[in-house]
Amino acid sequence: MWRIWRLFDPMRAMVAQAVFLLGLAVLIHLMLLGTNKYNWLDGAKKAPVATAVAPVPAEVTSLAQAK
């Protein structure tokens, strides 16, 4: 294994690896930010939920009005 470093300069190999990993991390984060589920900056966009309107009683009397 030590002979591989005779072919490649260790400093250039580590810098190239760091640049590659940084680029890969940025790419993955941008892909996740582009999705609705994993976008942690804007939060998940919730679809509007249709709700049924509950019937309200016709006449409501409070205790203050009853006195």
UniProtKB/Swiss-Prot annotation:
<dbReference type="Pfam" id="PF00556">
    <property type="entry name" value="LHC"/>
</dbReference>
<keyword id="KW-0157">Chromophore</keyword>
<comment type="function">
    <text>Antenna complexes are light-harvesting systems, which transfer the excitation energy to the reaction centers.</text>
</comment>
<dbReference type="GO" id="GO:0005886">
    <property type="term" value="C:plasma membrane"/>
</dbReference>
<dbReference type="InterPro" id="IPR018332">
    <property type="entry name" value="Antenna_alpha"/>
</dbReference>
<protein>
    <recommendedName>
        <fullName>Light-harvesting protein B-870 alpha chain</fullName>
    </recommendedName>
</protein>
<dbReference type="GO" id="GO:0030077">
    <property type="term" value="C:plasma membrane light-harvesting complex"/>
</dbReference>
<keyword id="KW-0437">Light-harvesting polypeptide</keyword>
<keyword id="KW-0479">Metal-binding</keyword>
<feature type="binding site" description="axial binding residue">
    <location>
        <position position="29"/>
    </location>
    <ligand>
        <name>a bacteriochlorophyll</name>
    </ligand>
</feature>
<dbReference type="InterPro" id="IPR035889">
    <property type="entry name" value="Light-harvesting_complex"/>
</dbReference>
<dbReference type="GO" id="GO:0046872">
    <property type="term" value="F:metal ion binding"/>
</dbReference>
<keyword id="KW-0460">Magnesium</keyword>
<feature type="topological domain" description="Periplasmic">
    <location>
        <begin position="34"/>
        <end position="67"/>
    </location>
</feature>
<dbReference type="InterPro" id="IPR000066">
    <property type="entry name" value="Antenna_a/b"/>
</dbReference>
<keyword id="KW-0997">Cell inner membrane</keyword>
<keyword id="KW-1003">Cell membrane</keyword>
<dbReference type="InterPro" id="IPR002361">
    <property type="entry name" value="Antenna_alpha_CS"/>
</dbReference>
<keyword id="KW-1133">Transmembrane helix</keyword>
<keyword id="KW-0812">Transmembrane</keyword>
<keyword id="KW-0148">Chlorophyll</keyword>
<comment type="similarity">
    <text>Belongs to the antenna complex alpha subunit family.</text>
</comment>
<feature type="transmembrane region" description="Helical">
    <location>
        <begin position="13"/>
        <end position="33"/>
    </location>
</feature>
<keyword id="KW-0042">Antenna complex</keyword>
<dbReference type="GO" id="GO:0019866">
    <property type="term" value="C:organelle inner membrane"/>
</dbReference>
<comment type="subunit">
    <text>An alpha/beta heterodimer. The core complex is formed by different alpha and beta chains, binding bacteriochlorophyll molecules, and arranged most probably in tetrameric structures disposed around the reaction center. The non-pigmented gamma chains may constitute additional components.</text>
</comment>
<keyword id="KW-0472">Membrane</keyword>
<feature type="topological domain" description="Cytoplasmic">
    <location>
        <begin position="1"/>
        <end position="12"/>
    </location>
</feature>
<keyword id="KW-0076">Bacteriochlorophyll</keyword>
<dbReference type="GO" id="GO:0019684">
    <property type="term" value="P:photosynthesis, light reaction"/>
</dbReference>
<dbReference type="GO" id="GO:0042314">
    <property type="term" value="F:bacteriochlorophyll binding"/>
</dbReference>
<dbReference type="GO" id="GO:0045156">
    <property type="term" value="F:electron transporter, transferring electrons within the cyclic electron transport pathway of photosynthesis activity"/>
</dbReference>
